[in-house]
Design a protein with these regions (language model features):
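Canonical P-loop GTPase G-domain recognition
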Residues: 147-206
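Short, flexible boundary segments at extreme N-termini or domain junctions of P-loop NTPases and their
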Residues: 1-25, 173, 188, 204
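Inter-motif core of Ras-like GTPase G domains
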Residues: 84-110, 122-130
Length: 206
């Protein structure tokens, strides 16, 4: 019975986009690369040089090789605290959330990140006053690792990076988060065509 309850709980949160995914939401901390990721998914060459405040993302075809899938219209919002209330508008049934975190600012943004993660999962589970959301998924995408490596004068294996993020945010102590949070952390260079293709393929081949 306990195993079934755990399975039902984790069913709220897919590890990657699934056939039930209808929308993509890219959220996160200021400067983590949200607009850069949207540009990469849309094959736009614009480089994010200023802070995004709020702009509409029109429906578009996400393409990778010969494969493609329609991505529903949504919004690209800023990463400041002012924009957190917009999460309620962007996360609906069937939404997969990519939450972007700049590995170089984890310590200074720790409290803000933890608060936002708690809000997202409470929304999905219906513990923030709403009805809850069905068929949603979630992943933390760790960005700017190249700068992190340069600052630390060495590279880290992926597993060590994930541990650094998980421990730095103390994910295990955030009430309401799935127990498998370590499996939901991925690293990515948003300026790398290969890494963008990996994300595209993950969304397309769901």
């Amino acid at each position: 019975m306990i195993d079934l309850l755990i399975y039902a709980l984790l069913g709220y949160f897919f590890l990657k986009p699934s056939k039930k995914t209808k929308k993509i939401a890219i959220l996160g901390i200021k400067g983590a690369g949200k607009t850069t990721l949207w540009n990469g998914l849309r094959d736009e060459s614009d480089v994010e040089t200023v802070t995004t405040h709020y702009q509409k993302i029109e429906e578009f075809s996400l393409k990778s090789g010969k494969d493609e899938v329609k991505i529903a219209s949504t919004k690209d919002i800023g990463g400041g605290d002012y924009y957190v209330p917009y999460y309620d508008e962007l996360i609906e049934d069937g939404t997969f959330v990519y939450f972007l975190v700049d590995i170089n600012t984890i310590k200074e943004n720790k409290d803000a990140i933890r608060m936002r993660l708690r809000k997202i999962f409470n929304m999905i589970k219906g513990e923030s006053g709403g009805a809850g959301k069905k068929d949603c998924g979630f992943k933390i995408l760790v960005t700017h690792t190249d700068v992190f490596f340069n600052n630390n004068l060495k590279r880290m294996p992926k597993a060590q990076l994930i541990e650094y993020v998980s421990d730095g945010l103390e994910l295990a102590t955030i009430k309401g988060l799935p127990r498998d949070m370590a499996k939901r952390i991925e690293t990515g260079n948003l300026n790398s065509p290969n890494d963008i293709k990996t994300i595209k393929d993950e969304i397309i081949h769901r």
